Amino acid sequence: MNVLSCSINTLKGLYDISGVEVGQHFYWQIGGFQVHGQVLITSWVVIAILLGSATIAVRNPQTIPTGGQNFFEYVLEFIRDVSKTQIGEEYGPWVPFIGTMFLFIFVSNWSGALLPWKIIQLPHGELAAPTNDINTTVALALLTSVAYFYAGLTKKGLGYFGKYIQPTPILLPINILEDFTKPLSLSFRLFGNILADELVVVVLVSLVPLVVPIPVMLLGLFTSGIQALIFATLAAAYIGESMEGHH
C-alpha cells in the first residue's frame, strides 16, 4: 500500500511538472493597446543595470584605467574588434549599435540565471529573462534588419537593390527570401536557446537536489554568453555584407 501511495505521489509530481505552462503573460492595457508588461519590466531592469554600471565605472575616469573603467574599456575594445573584423574599415559608426546589442543580450541572458525573478509575483505568468520571450528576440532581429538595410542604402543608394539580381536575375526570389530568413534565424536561435536552458534548469531543480543542477546552470551561463556573441557577430556580418555587396 505504501509503495502504491509513493508511486501515485511520484506520478502526481511528474504530472505537476509537465503541467507547467509556457506562454502565460502579464499584460498592461494602455489606451487601446495591449502592452507586454513582464518583458518591459525585465528589460527596464537590464537597461538600469547597464546604465548604472557604466555610470559608476566612468564617473571618475583615470589616465591609467583601473577596476570598473579597465573592465569597460576591455569590453569596448572587444566589441571594436568584432565590428572591425565583420564590417571592415568603416566599422566606426556601427560600434555603438553592435555594442548595445551584445551587452543587452548578454546581460538579459545572464539575468535569467542570476536574478531571482521568481520571487516577484504577477497576476499572470512570471518574470524571466527578456530574451526568454519571442517578442524581444524578434524586435532585436528586426532592428538588425533595419540597420543593414540602412547601411546598404547609405553606402550605395538605390544601387543597393542591384544585389537581388546578382549573379543572375533567376536568383531574385531566393535573394529576397534571404532577407526574410535572416531576422527569423536570429530571433528563433536566441529565443530557443534561452528558453530551453531555463526549462532544463527548472525541471532539474524540481526533480533532483539543488546541488545537482549547478553544472547545468554554469553551462547555461557559458552558452548565454556565446549566444550574445553570435547574435552581435552575425549582426555585424550582415551590416558588412550590405555595405560591400553580394557574396
UniProtKB/Swiss-Prot annotation:
PANTHER family per the UniProt record, alphabetical: ATP SYNTHASE SUBUNIT A, CHLOROPLASTIC
Subunit: F-type ATPases have 2 components, CF(1) - the catalytic core - and CF(0) - the membrane proton channel. CF(1) has five subunits: alpha(3), beta(3), gamma(1), delta(1), epsilon(1). CF(0) has four main subunits: a, b, b' and c.
Transmembrane feature ranges: 38-58, 95-115, 134-154, 199-219, 220-240
Source organism per UniProt: Nicotiana tabacum
InterPro entries: ATP_syn_F0_a_bact/chloroplast, ATP_synth_F0_asu, ATP_synth_F0_asu_AS, F0_ATP_A_sf
Keywords: ATP synthesis, CF(0), Chloroplast, Hydrogen ion transport, Ion transport, Membrane, Plastid, Thylakoid, Transmembrane, Transmembrane helix, Transport
One of the record's GO molecular function terms: proton-transporting ATP synthase activity, rotational mechanism
GO cellular component annotations of the record: chloroplast thylakoid membrane; plasma membrane; proton-transporting ATP synthase complex
Similarity remark: Belongs to the ATPase A chain family.
Lipid bilayer topology: Multi-pass membrane protein
Entry keyword Transmembrane helix: yes
Gene for this chain: atpI
HAMAP family in the cross-refs: ATP_synth_a_bact
CDD domains reported for this sequence: ATP-synt_Fo_a_6 (cd00310)
Principal subcellular localization: plastid
Function: Key component of the proton channel; it plays a direct role in the translocation of protons across the membrane.
Subcellular location, record wording: Plastid, Chloroplast thylakoid membrane
Protein name: ATP synthase subunit a, chloroplastic
Entry-linked SUPFAM superfamilies: F1F0 ATP synthase subunit A (SSF81336)
Top-level taxon: Eukaryota
A Pfam family per the record: ATP-synt_A
